[in-house]
Amino acid sequence: MNILLSNDDGIMSPGIITLKTYLQQKHDVYVVAPDIERSATGHGITVRNPLWAKKVKFGDTFFGHAVNGTPADCVKIGLDAIYKDIHFDVVISGINRGANLGTDVLYSGTVSAALEGAVGGYPSIAVSCVDFSNPNFEDGAKVVLNILEKLDLNNWPEFTTLNVNIPKIPYDEMKGIKITKQSRRRYQDYFEERKDPFGNSYYWMLGNIIEDDNDDNSDYNVINQGYVAVTPLSVFMTKYDFIDELKSWLEV
C-alpha cells in the first residue's frame, strides 16, 4: 500500500526513521515531515508565510521532504502538492517520543498530523511510545505493522483517526491490543518567572498531571495494564448530549 508518513519530532528523529525502515519492507512509504521538532504545535497551519519542501537524504539515500511548517502543514502539502498524483491508502504520524493520552491530543502535533489526513478523507493513524526517556521505536514499529495487517482500510469511517499509544514494556511482554476511550488526563499548569542574563523576566511553563477518575477502559489505564491502547478519534467535536439543554437556555 501507499503510505504518507509524517510526525512532529522532525524528519531526522529516530521515531520516523525507524518506522519508515520497517514499513518500507512491505509498503511504499513517502515521508513529508517538519524540518525541525514541532512538538505540541497542535493543528496550526501556515497561511501567511511560504512553505519550503526540501529533499532530505539519510546517508546516501533519499529519505523524504522536510517542510518549514507544522505537522498539519506537512500532511496538507504532501497530499495536495508534493505527492498529489499518488493514491494514498493511509496517513501515519509518528512514532512520537512520549505519550499522547487524554487531553494531550488537543496539543499534539503527532495527532494533529493524523487528523489532517482524516480531514482530507484518508484513513489515518497517530503512533506514540509512552516511554519518553528511552523509547523503543523498533518495538513501536512492530506494533504498527501488526495493526496495519489487521485493519480494513476499505471500510474506514469518515473523518476518523486511530490514536495508538504503546506501553513502556518490551514487545514480547505486551499483552495485546485494547480499544479504548480518551482518559480524563489533563494538566495543572503553572509558570515560573525567571530572569535572563540581562535581567529581563521570562516565563517557563511547568505542570503536574491530573488523573481524574478513569474507568478500566481509558487509554491511560489500559497502557498501565500492559496493553497497546488504540483510541478512535473524530475530527468533529460536537457535544451532542448537551444540545437539547443548551437549546432550552438560548432558543427562547
Swiss-Prot record:
Cell compartments where the protein resides: Cytoplasm
Keyword field: Cytoplasm, Hydrolase, Metal-binding, Nucleotide-binding
InterPro entries: SurE, SurE-like_Pase/nucleotidase, SurE-like_sf
Ligand binding (a divalent metal cation): 8-9, 39, 96
Enzyme Commission (EC) number: 3.1.3.5
Record Pfam families: SurE (PF01975)
Enzyme class label: hydrolase
Keyword check for Cytoplasm: yes
Required cofactor names: a divalent metal cation
Catalytic activity: a ribonucleoside 5'-phosphate + H2O = a ribonucleoside + phosphate
Record function comment: Nucleotidase that shows phosphatase activity on nucleoside 5'-monophosphates.
Protein name, as recorded: 5'-nucleotidase SurE
Source species: Petrotoga mobilis (strain DSM 10674 / SJ95)
Gene that this polypeptide is encoded by: surE
